[in-house]
Each structure stands twice: as structure tokens, then as C-alpha cells.
Curated annotation (Swiss-Prot):
HAMAP family, per the entry: BioW
One term of GO molecular function: ATP binding
Pathway annotation from the record: Metabolic intermediate metabolism; pimeloyl-CoA biosynthesis; pimeloyl-CoA from pimelate: step 1/1
Catalytic activity: heptanedioate + ATP + CoA = 6-carboxyhexanoyl-CoA + AMP + diphosphate
A family per Pfam: BioW
Highest taxon of source: Bacteria
Gene: bioW
Entry protein name: 6-carboxyhexanoate--CoA ligase
Quaternary context: Homodimer.
Length: 245
């Protein structure tokens, strides 16, 4: 099996800006088709055309771990303020402090990163080693049968089901790590105003109007129960091959 990953970016004011990314785990026979799809996708994003596209094809030599996909539910809110209240209620019910939640929102809004921030679920302290890059969840794929089942489930709720599938895949891997309590995600796509929170206890909760249309600020925060071996957690999220079933 092979891990195939794409990242597209563009330089603005001498700073590399993330445009789009995607990845999966494939048989050798699928790679050529997937490469064409990823290259096309890199140039068809609403955030504009990139000036740099990096595609990585890497053989997987270790056993691929399987994890269960989180159950999916959708909550409809009318504004970012209403969405925040819902998020606060849900996350506090599983032990995440207000301080941690405010810290996560502050990092997402003020310090845009390629990856996710790690937030202590009680103190709100940032725990990731590289606070510029963050943590990038990688080497993931969803089983075809599970993917088709979820697409049927959400097809009437989303015009971009593939985007939802990719997010569920990430969230399911993240939630499978014992010390991760929950995840908060807000898309940096200006046209996409649906975000989510996810955890083993809550499942994957899609939340409408988590931000206003046109806003490009977004990111991910993983709430972590301490003590936690951050190096081990980072290695699992970034390097352990996982198939979501």
C-alpha cells in the first residue's frame, strides 16, 4: 500500500499560504488515477490557484491500524454566536474548561497554522512543540464501503460530501488516541461555514454557521488530557497509517 499526499500553496507577502490539501492510502494500481485527481483538485480551489504543488507518494511498510468512524450528527445554528454557545455546552459536558475553549478560539483566529494546535483541556496551555507549523494529521484513508454509506447519509445535508468524508476521517483518527478528549475545527475556506467538534463521547457533530461567509480564518484544535507524551501523540497523528472503517 502507498500513502499519497498533496499540498498546494501560494506565496503572499513573502509568506506561504495554504490553498488546499488531500491524501489517502492506495494500491499501486490506483496511484496514477489518484495523482491526476489530486493535481486537478489543487488548481480548482475557491482560495485561488497555487504557485506550488507538492505531491508525495510513499510506500507504507508497517501494519495499517483500523479505527471506527465516528457517528455523524448535524446541528443547525443561526450565527457564530449561537454556534459558540452550542460548542461550549457540548465540550464542557465532557470536561473541557472554558479557559481551554477560549484558548483554542484565540489560537485559531490569531495564529493561523498549517496544522492543528494542541490545547491542555483544563489549563488551556498550548502543548505542540512547533507552534508555527502545528500538528498535521496524515496517512489516513476511509474504507470504500463506509465512505459510500456516509455519503448516502449526508447527501441531503451537504453539497460537498467528499469534504465531510475527509473531515470525518481525520476526526476519527484523532479521537482514537486515548489522551485526546475532543477536536474543534473551523474551515479556512471562505465559502464554507460549517465546522465541527468531535470526540469519542460526542461523535462527529457538524455545526452550521460556525463562522460568517467570506472569512478566511480557520484551523483545528485538539484538546488533550494531561499528562500526555506529546512526542508519542504527534508521531501517531502524523505518521501512523490508519484506515477508518
Amino acid at each position: 500500500m502507498w500513502s499519497v499526499r498533496m499540498r498546494a500553496s501560494k506565496k503572499e507577502n513573502n509568506i506561504e499560504k495554504h490553498i488546499s490539501g488531500a491524501e489517502g492510502i492506495y494500491d499501486y494500481s490506483q496511484i496514477e488515477r489518484v495523482l491526476k485527481q489530486l493535481f486537478k483538485r489543487a488548481f480548482e480551489h475557491s482560495k485561488g490557484k497555487p504557485d506550488k504543488v507538492v505531491i508525495t507518494v510513499e510506500r507504507i511498510n508497517e501494519e495499517i491500524q483500523t479505527v471506527s468512524a465516528l457517528p455523524v450528527n448535524t446541528f443547525f445554528t443561526n450565527s457564530p454566536e449561537e454556534a459558540f454557545c452550542l460548542i461550549s455546552e457540548k465540550l464542557s459536558s465532557i470536561g473541557i474548561s472554558d479557559k481551554a475553549l477560549f484558548s483554542a478560539f484565540e489560537v485559531i483566529k490569531k495564529y493561523p497554522m498549517r496544522g492543528a494546535t494542541l490545547i491542555d483541556s483544563i489549563t488551556g496551555e498550548r502543548l505542540e512543540r512547533d507552534k508555527t507549523r502545528g500538528i498535521r494529521v496524515s496517512r489516513i484513508h476511509m474504507d470504500k464501503r463506509k465512505r459510500m454509506k456516509l455519503i448516502r447519509q449526508i447527501k441531503n445535508l451537504s453539497t460537498q460530501p467528499q469534504r465531510v468524508i475527509e473531515a470525518i476521517t481525520i476526526a476519527s483518527k484523532v479521537a482514537s488516541y486515548p489522551e485526546v478528549v475532543a477536536e474543534l475545527c473551523i474551515s479556512d475556506n471562505p465559502d464554507y461555514t460549517i465546522g465541527y467538534i468531535a470526540s469519542r463521547d460526542l461523535g462527529y457533530l457538524r455545526i452550521t454557521n460556525i463562522k460568517n461567509k467570506g472569512e478566511t480564518i480557520g484551523g483545528r484544535a485538539f484538546f488533550v488530557k494531561t499528562p500526555c507524551d506529546i512526542e508519542k501523540l504527534t508521531n501517531y497523528l502524523e505518521r501512523k497509517p490508519v484506515l477508518v472503517i
